[in-house]
Amino acid sequence: MRIGIAGMQTTELAAKSIQETLSDAGFDSFYFRNNSKTTMADLVIVLGGDRGVRNYFHRALDVDTPVLGISESESNGVLAQIELKELPSYLNRIKKQDYVIEDVPRIGVKVDGKNTYPVLNDVSVFTSKSATLMEYILRVNDEEVWHDSSDGVIISTPTGSSAYSLSAGGPIIFQASNVFGIISVNSLDITRRPIIVSDNSIIEIDEISSRLHCDVVLDGIDRFKINNKLEATKFTPSARIIRMKADSTAVSALANKVKLAEELLSMPPSSKLLLKILEYEGSMTQKELASKTLLPGRTVRLAMKHLMDKGYIKRNVSMQDARQKIYEIAKLD
């Protein structure tokens, strides 16, 4: 079996370490940056946790090769189930191909008529400044569903339903469900509820307007200015993800949310924000967190200490740079 090694910001040193582990177990492996080389592999190991896997599939030219997502350390990953330190214990199963390959749905996105890359979690529309209302019309298969005024709107896959969508009041959707969720964020209409549609639907967010310009946000990573219309449809082919563990990502995500709920109510706003960013984005450095949230460095440090004291996050040494510390969500027992 030939294994490719890729990952967001993966260093050649880290890749070499994994290659040595694979070589000792009898695997032929190679490290690559150009996704066109995935055709040379029977399986691709992607580092960087869920965020690394999402980033990989945003750029992948060939998605037929199944992907095994790996986190650098402890993580409640949905796309990346296993930790780097666990990899040696799974190599025998990998050699025997004793795993399940799951077809994970993706959403194809058009912004004002132009295609973007497909998303694994969600696509959303918000104004360029938070807490600013936008108006839009939601259409499903050319039928108008609602005319809304809200902070934004999210279209989610089953995978993304346990991420930002859930925090905005959306439902948890089990992985095998052939549906997408649509969630209005803080609508002025208090009766507005999330809806579930077939993943074969054509979803349109149309006639978008606000006193500020609006942005499309893809998987919580990239933002693009939008003038009038977003179209979302099922994208083929799906992403092929290797599952080494049989636990239900939907059930485990819900259990974690319930366990956190009580203490979240009394948590400082800065801690809530940082926890949410780590939950959605995956492992990040303190500098990355400050840049992402625009919080002062001192506020970030105090909030991270609070979260570590509570056991919500862990601090680890980056495998890419031993001088650098990374933070990520800790597993809940």
What are these regions (language model features)?
Residues 308-318:
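A short, conserved structural fragment
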Residues 1-47, 52-62, 81-102, 110-117, ...:
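ATP/NTP phosphate-donor binding region
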Residues 278-281:
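Short helix-capping/hinge SLiMs at alpha-helix to coil transitions
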